[in-house]
A protein has these predicted regions:
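Short histidine-centered catalytic/ligand-binding loop motif
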Residues: 94-107
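Residue-level detector of alpha-helix boundaries and kinks
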Residues: 1, 5, 99-100, 136
Length: 163
């Protein structure tokens, strides 16, 4: 039976999103007073889809995840996956309180540090280690600073067959 790449992507996203929601520092810096259980941050502040909807998310901090892959050759057993993480917030929320775990950092820079700590060199989401390949400061628009990060992960190709 061949590996289903879409199923592999869904599984990777689930592991990544869960690790973000289980990180008390990420939960603290996202600072959503409407959420009591960190698992409720999914689809509120942490999205397993690419999400840039600044009208709805005007005063919110968001982490969204996208996973893509390149086509593999018929002979490839291992396939490269790219995990893209977009972190953005409104300009008004960039500064974090001095008492926060993120003191001395902007909100998106601190969240990027935590994401990198969780994903870079992680062996939880693929075969071998995930590797950070880009980490770029950007903005969604004039009111929403952002950080884009890309990790490379190896997984099984759809050509791989269990024996």
């Amino acid at each position: 039976m061949a590996i289903n790449i879409s199923k592999q992507i869904s599984s990777m996203k689930s592991v990544i999103i869960t690790s973000f929601m289980n990180d008390p520092n990420i939960v603290s810096v996202i600072d959503n007073a409407n959420v009591e259980d960190p698992q409720d941050l999914e689809y509120e502040n942490i999205f397993p889809t690419w999400r840039i909807d600044t009208a709805e998310l005007e005063k919110r901090t968001v982490i969204s995840v996208k996973i893509s892959t390149t086509s593999s050759k018929k002979s490839d057993v291992v396939q490269r996956f790219f995990v893209d993480v977009l972190i953005f917030t409104s300009q008004e929320l960039q500064k974090v309180p001095r008492t926060s775990v993120a003191r001395g950092c902007t909100r998106i820079d601190y969240l990027a540090q935590r994401v990198e700590d969780i994903l870079n060199r992680s062996t939880e989401i693929g075969l071998g280690e995930a590797h950070l390949i880009t980490n770029e400061e950007d903005s969604i628009d004039s009111r929403h600073p952002a950080r884009m990060m890309r990790f490379e992960v190896l997984g099984f190709s759809s050509n791989y067959v269990y024996l």
